[in-house]
């Protein structure tokens, strides 16, 4: 899996508290190993966000992304609280 990082993801990641940054990095390690792990709650988004997917990091924290070629390439679009990231 090749990870790409959108500017919005990088900007949002920088604003996270240290504990949440660690949780995001741990989740991404797990995601790279097994993108469909049930614990990640990997799911397609609907409505205005159709074509995008999201995984759960911890509690309210989500990562929104797109994937191509069966997860060969993943672009991380945003990270943050549920209500904020679903307003892309």
Question: Residue ranges of each PLM-predicted region?
Answer:
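Generic leucine side-chain signal with a strong bias for well-ordered alpha-helical environments
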Residues: 16, 28, 45, 76-77
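A short, surface-exposed loop/turn module that caps and links secondary-structure elements
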Residues: 30-55
